[in-house]
Amino acid sequence: MVKIKEVAMNIKINEIKMTPPTAFTPGQVIEEQEVISPSMLALQELQETTGAALYETMEEIGMALSGKLRENYKFTDAEKLERRQQALLRLIKQIQEDNGATLRPLTEENSDPDLQNAYQIIALAMALTAGGLSKKKKRDLQSQLDTLTAEEGWELAVFSLLELGEVDTATLSSLKRFMQQAIDNDEMPLSQWFRRVADWPDRCERVRILLRAVAFELSICIEPSEQSRLAAALVRLRRLLLFLGLEKECQREEWICQLPPNTLLPLLLDIICERWLFSDWLLDRLTAIVSSSKMFNRLLQQLDAQFMLIPDNCFNDEDQREQILETLREVKINQVLF
């Protein structure tokens, strides 16, 4: 393993992670409603969940998200390495500017070679982006970074440390498995992806880790077929993160409609995953979770507002939003319960 020379190691990575959605408490409802609308709450939560640094990472692969994949240009190994490093340095610089990042030494428990290499890569990248280095010093640090980043698979470990601060081997292994499944399995509906991450601690942060890792892979990918698979995985993960950003708003609406905890967000995802939403299907799902006709009608109103708010990228196509709203309003007009 390459030794790091003269790199400042007084860094606390766990101080730079973006704040996930906070738990909702019913006592907050009236006060929040008086200050800000439910729609604005949800929009703020979406923005908070995605974060500026992630958009910086995804900027280069915007063409892939729009379906305009790169032509089959052959990068040399040196060009691939340079692209990866430049993307890493941009991300590190952005995080430092946003949060004033520092790095804490690894504990003895973090003896995983991948994590140790990732720690050294982050420290080197931070030193290089800090500026004020002599040419010789910069050249020495760059040489060390070249050696470490020449090995494959460092990205996921780096992003895990940046986002979570402390990562163990089991967490890193589970992220590797999930990332490969996200790339390979293009048939699984979004609702099932959500159920796979539902019990994860720090699930928003972990999905962000996967997004950054897939974005990095796509940024240097040259095979058109692989570009398509990576771009599709990126879209799926981005949609999943957008829905996770609605969690706090869904908790608020669960309290308003007297629903069991953790039922509304899965319902939104199930609705989105229906190719065509039928009123009978929707009626069965809603009556299973409401306690009265009053709460049923209130839930319909909340869902109507939600689906008017949800960003376009959450839907399967440009017509789905309107079809869902039409079905919700059909149920509201025609159905009399209890």
Curated annotation (Swiss-Prot):
**GO cellular component term of the entry, any:** outer membrane
Q: What's a BP term from Gene Ontology annotated to this protein?
A: protein transport
UniProt keywords, alphabetically = Protein transport, Transport
InterPro entries the record matches: HrpJ-like, T3SS_TyeA-rel, TyeA_sf
Read off the Gene3D superfamilies from this record: 1.20.1280.80
Q: List the disulfide bonds.
A: none
- Which Pfam families does the entry link to? HrpJ
Annotated protein name in UniProt: Secretion system apparatus protein SsaL
Instruction: Name its species.
Output: Salmonella typhimurium (strain LT2 / SGSC1412 / ATCC 700720)
